[in-house]
C-alpha cells in the first residue's frame, strides 16, 4: 500500500480505541473538537467518530453535545462518521446495549434520532455519514484526509 509521508493524522488523546492508520504518520494530541484531524490543519478539518446508535442516543439530549456540534460547525470540513448503518437507527433500541425490559421506557425514538441527525447537517453544516462498521469508517476517514489535504495544499499553491 502507498504511504503518505506528508500527512500526519492527529488522534485525540481521549480516543480510547483509535483507528489504526498504518499508511500514515500518527500523532496523539488533545484536540479541541473531534477525534481526528490532520497536523497543520487542526482548525480546518475534524472528524467526530460515533461507534453506536446507543452512543448517539445518550449524547443527543445533552447540552454538552450541542456545544460539540456548535464547535464542529466552525470548521471548513466537519464530519461525523457513524460506525453503524441507517437500519441500526431504524431498529433502535434493538441491538443497543439497553436491557430489553427498559425498551418501553425510553423516550428517544428512531424518528427523533434521524430528525436530530438531519439537523446536524442542515443547521450546523456537518457531514454525517453512515459507514456500517468501524473498518469502513476508518477507510473513509483516510480518503477524506487525503482529499482535504491535497485540496488545501493546491489552494495554498494558487494563492
Give the label of every model feature segment.
Residues 27-33, 37-159:
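Extended, alpha-helix-rich binding/interface surfaces that flank or overlap catalytic cores
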Amino acid at each position: 500500500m502507498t504511504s503518505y509521508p506528508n500527512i500526519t493524522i492527529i488522534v485525540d488523546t481521549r480516543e480510547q480505541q483509535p483507528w489504526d492508520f498504518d499508511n500514515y504518520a500518527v500523532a496523539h494530541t488533545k484536540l479541541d473538537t473531534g477525534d481526528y484531524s490532520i497536523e497543520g490543519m487542526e482548525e480546518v478539518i475534524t472528524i467526530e467518530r460515533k461507534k453506536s446508535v446507543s452512543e448517539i442516543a445518550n449524547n443527543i439530549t445533552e447540552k454538552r453535545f450541542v456545544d460539540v456540534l456548535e464547535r464542529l460547525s466552525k470548521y471548513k470540513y466537519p464530519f461525523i462518521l457513524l460506525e453503524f448503518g441507517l437500519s441500526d437507527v431504524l431498529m433502535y433500541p434493538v441491538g443497543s446495549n439497553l436491557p430489553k425490559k427498559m425498551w418501553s421506557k425510553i423516550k428517544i425514538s428512531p424518528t427523533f434520532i434521524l430528525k436530530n441527525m438531519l439537523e446536524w447537517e442542515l443547521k450546523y453544516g456537518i457531514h454525517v455519514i453512515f459507514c456500517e462498521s468501524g473498518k469502513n469508517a476508518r477507510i473513509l476517514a483516510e480518503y477524506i484526509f487525503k482529499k482535504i489535504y491535497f485540496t488545501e495544499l493546491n489552494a495554498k499553491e494558487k494563492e
